[in-house]
């Protein structure tokens, strides 16, 4: 969707009772600019990067951008940070994807200091630090990053989580008072088409090393190893054919909106505090789905 058309949609989201809007950063726009538009067309919504990585922007630039976002949103901005993946960091941007846990830790420590008005490493100091602390949420898939998020961040943001594994993530995070968000891909439409789309998306993610390790950690290694081997061997069609259908159905929201809402309620009951919806549909369908998932339909 063109950014100049985003404003009315943001107003609709706010009027429908949603708590926040989250902006991803992958192959489309950067993670911050859509939130600037959202800030201008909302009064209450939290505006969250979900996520920007700690490699492709230096820490001083991240601090400057976070401060600007806090300013333009009147304190509603939440900085979602993460290590991302070797694909985005190294393959697309030419930056070594090294020491992700240490890099995230160092970046958060730096940002906490600089956003509070102190000097960071190298002597950088913000001329206009935010009036209030900027909350930080960390992208976290496996145990070490989940525990790091529990220790140094205001919340954790996970992804591609099967319902049967929510308890494992909640137990590892072990911070009942902090936000535990999860992104959900909602794919409406005929079930066969939706399942095919979900399967292709699953394979594209599951074959990225950080997600391969994530699914192994969750206990699904035996299910995904054949498709990962096929993908790495160059047979992508076979990889899609080998995708475990039951696992795909556990992760993605398929079918009518009411059925998808019921699935989200199950995740909430299991311990997910914030459901971040990624709606896979033509732009013309967005208003209907926004209303369908609304907190106050």
Where are the regions that the model predicts?
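Active-site-adjacent structural elements that line small-molecule/cofactor binding pockets in enzymes
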Residues: 1-297
């Amino acid at each position: 969707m063109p950014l100049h058309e985003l404003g009315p949609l943001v107003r609709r989201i706010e009027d429908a009772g949603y708590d926040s809007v989250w902006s991803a950063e992958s192959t489309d726009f950067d993670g911050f600019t859509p939130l600037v538009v959202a800030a201008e067309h909302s009064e209450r919504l939290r505006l969250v990067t979900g996520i920007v990585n700690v490699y492709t922007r230096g820490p001083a630039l991240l601090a400057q951008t976070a401060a600007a976002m806090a300013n333009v949103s009147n304190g509603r901005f939440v900085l979602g940070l993460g290590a991302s993946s070797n694909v985005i960091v190294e393959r697309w941007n030419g930056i070594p994807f090294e020491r992700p846990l240490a890099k995230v830790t160092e970046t958060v420590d730096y940002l906490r200091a600089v956003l509070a008005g102190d000097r960071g490493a190298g002597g950088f100091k913000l001329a206009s630090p935010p009036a209030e602390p900027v909350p930080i949420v960390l992208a976290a898939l496996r145990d070490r990053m989940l525990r790091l998020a529990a220790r140094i961040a205001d919340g954790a943001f996970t992804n591609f989580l099967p319902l049967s594994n929510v308890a494992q993530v909640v137990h590892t995070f072990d911070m009942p008072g902090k936000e535990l968000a999860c992104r959900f891909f909602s794919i409406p439409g005929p079930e066969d088409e939706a399942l095919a789309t979900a399967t292709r998306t699953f394979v594209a993610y599951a074959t990225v090393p950080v997600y391969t390790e994530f699914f192994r950690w969750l206990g699904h290694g035996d299910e995904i190893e054949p498709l990962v081997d096929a993908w790495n061997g160059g047979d992508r069609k076979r990889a899609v054919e080998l995708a475990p259908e039951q696992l795909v159905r556990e992760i993605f929201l398929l079918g009518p909106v009411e059925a998808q809402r019921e699935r989200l309620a199950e995740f909430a009951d299991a311990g997910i505090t914030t459901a971040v919806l990624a709606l896979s549909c033509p732009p013309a369908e967005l208003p209907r789905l926004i209303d369908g998932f609304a907190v106050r339909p």
